[in-house]
């Protein structure tokens, strides 16, 4: 009952919080992909319940005994020479108290040249951000439902300005072992700034995601379907390149349809041989494709692909994600 009560309180609070997307809130790095596997499957996956200890950074309900004593370290050369990495570790105290999880995300924005309002150089400065999370999950009674939560401590330093914050992720997952089907609902980054950059309090990038996945019966493929940013339906913005100008010079901007909005909330992913020592991964983000593609070129924006290899007790994963003709990332 206490779990259900907490769930109701959180969602009641969310209903009075304005939905936030990129550029509308602080600590945006909290929504960076947590692993190459996640990046390869389109950028967001909520339903992997296996050895993958980094999955719990996005959905704490997936913390399970298979993660016991698993350590993951990931590094990405991101856009604009930004470097970031994640690390995660899980430990099972005993089968009754189950498994605890610790996760870390760190972003280094590099060095910048500073200038004052008169164009006089003020030297170089740096920027970096980090988040440390502690998570735990447990089964709800004897049902097929599991509940988990992460508590995150956030620090950010941009030039001479710094900020600290605290947030929580709350996740639920339904696991049907007979059908090999999982469904998850996650509320991420529900929190506040404890100290601000310059006296003005900013909201955190609150996000509600829904994920589904299933292992096909006769084919070694697990499909993933994720609906992201459910807290805000009109997620798309008109593309100026698609505006129409009539003979009188009047301009009509692009109208974003219901179907277009629906697809921009959608991420698809498939994993071939997910339980073997070698597997292939492919993902597609409709939103990334629509927002970053160039109309006159076919550059496969939104597409990502990767591989996974296992050597004894060590796993290696690599992913390449397409953003635009000018920028792609490796993880």
List each language-model region with its residue ranges.
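Subset of outer-membrane beta-barrel
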Residues: 20-331
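Bacterial Sec-dependent N-terminal signal peptides
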Residues: 1-24, 270
């Amino acid at each position: 009952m206490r779990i259900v009560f907490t769930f109701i309180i959180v969602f009641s609070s969310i209903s009075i919080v304005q939905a936030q997307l990129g550029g509308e809130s602080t600590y945006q790095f909290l929504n960076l992909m947590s692993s190459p596997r996640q990046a390869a499957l389109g950028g967001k996956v909520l339903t992997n319940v296996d050895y993958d200890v980094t999955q719990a950074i996005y959905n704490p309900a997936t913390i399970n005994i298979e993660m016991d004593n698993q350590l993951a370290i990931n590094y990405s050369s991101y856009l604009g020479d930004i470097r970031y990495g994640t690390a995660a570790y899980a430990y099972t105290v005993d089968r009754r108290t189950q498994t605890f999880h610790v996760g870390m995300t760190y972003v280094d924005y590099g060095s910048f040249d500073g200038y004052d309002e008169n164009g006089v150089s003020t030297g170089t400065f740096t920027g970096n951000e980090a988040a440390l999370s502690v998570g735990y999950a447990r089964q709800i009674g004897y049902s097929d439902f599991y509940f988990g939560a992460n508590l995150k401590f956030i620090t950010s330093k941009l030039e001479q300005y710094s900020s600290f914050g605290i947030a929580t992720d709350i996740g639920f997952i339904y696991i049907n072992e007979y059908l090999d089907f999982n469904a998850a609902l996650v509320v991420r980054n529900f929190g506040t700034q404890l100290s601000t950059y310059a006296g003005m309090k900013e909201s955190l990038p609150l996000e509600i995601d829904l994920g589904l996945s299933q292992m096909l019966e006769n084919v070694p493929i697990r499909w993933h379907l994720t609906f992201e940013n459910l807290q805000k339906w009109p997620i798309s913005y008109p593309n100026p390149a698609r505006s129409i100008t009539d003979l009188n010079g009047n301009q009509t901007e692009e109208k974003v349809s219901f179907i277009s909005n629906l697809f921009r909330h959608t991420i698809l992913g498939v994993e071939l041989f997910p339980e073997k020592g070698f597997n292939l991964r492919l993902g597609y983000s409709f939103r990334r494709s629509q927002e970053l593609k160039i109309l006159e070129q076919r550059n496969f924006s939104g597409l990502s692909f990767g591989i996974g290899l296992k050597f004894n007790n060590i796993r290696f994963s690599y992913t390449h994600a397409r953003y635009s003709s000018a920028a792609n990332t490796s993880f």
